[in-house]
Regions:
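N-terminal loops that bind phosphate or other acidic moieties
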Residues: 1, 25-243
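Basic polycationic patches enriched in arginine
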Residues: 2-5, 21
Length: 243
């Protein structure tokens, strides 16, 4: 599948130059589709690739309103997570997500480690013991992940954080399923909403984290956490809902 051209250049050019490892991770047709352990494994590997490719861009964003280390830290964490994948026993999707979450907590510095660690740990808790994830399972997992991130970071919409990409992604996904969309189409709509939420952070004044210290000067800059969150939601859609 060819990835749509992204709105921002990264370290190695436009985001559109990256393509996922698989064109279609779905089993089955129509609404009744699911993704399995191997598909989740590919998702994690694909996200690690994206973060590695966009490391410098994420760090550039963070240099404007943060500690200039978001891309570096996220890349360190995802590379460490890759090293854990081969040691996982195939089958339990939740265990795979949890392994990633625990690794991110222990290896990613700053606020990103606890927040992304919580996100993946909540995905793991919601899918614990499952060998496949269906559309409703992912809705529950995404909802749990967003709630976990909010609880950990005490963030609300328009605080200029990763929540500003994740909440629209969750809401769009749930709305799409409610409209009768397929799993794949719901994932695509989720990614589109996450991108819109990410862009909407640009004019916001930060109310959380290091960026909040800048006050009004934080306006006019895209939030790096919202950007890496959009990249995650986009990678889910690109890997599992390939055209």
């Amino acid at each position: 599948m060819r990835v749509a051209r992204g709105p921002h250049p990264g370290a190695n050019g436009w985001l559109g130059s990256w393509s996922p490892r698989s064109s279609d991770g779905f089993h089955g047709k129509g609404v009744e589709v699911s993704v399995g352990y191997e598909d989740v494994d590919r998702l994690i590997r694909a996200y690690a690739d994206v973060i590695a490719d966009q490391k410098d861009y994420l760090t550039q964003l963070d240099s404007a309103i943060g500690d200039a280390d978001h891309g570096i830290n996220m890349n360190r964490g995802m590379q460490a997570a890759l090293a854990k994948l081969d040691g996982q026993a195939p089958g339990d999707v939740g265990a795979l997500f949890k392994a990633v979450g625990m690794t991110l907590v222990s290896t990613v510095g700053g606020a990103g480690g606890p927040l992304y660690g919580t996100l993946f740990l909540q995905l793991g808790t919601a899918t614990a013991g499952k060998e496949v994830i269906e559309a409703a399972d992912w809705a529950a997992a995404l909802s749990a992940a967003v709630a976990g991130v909010q609880a950990r970071g005490k963030a609300e919409p328009q605080d200029k954080t990763m929540v500003d990409a994740l909440i629209p992604a969750r809401d769009a996904y749930e709305a799409a399923l409610g409209d009768g969309a397929t799993f794949a189409d719901a994932l695509r709509r989720s990614a589109t909403a996450a991108e819109e939420g990410m862009k909407a952070t640009i004019p916001l004044v930060a109310r959380k984290g290091r960026a909040s210290y800048l006050g009004e000067r934080s306006a006019g800059h895209q939030d790096p956490g919202a950007t890496s969150s959009w990249l995650l939601v986009k990678t889910v859609a690109d890997t599992w809902a390939g055209d």
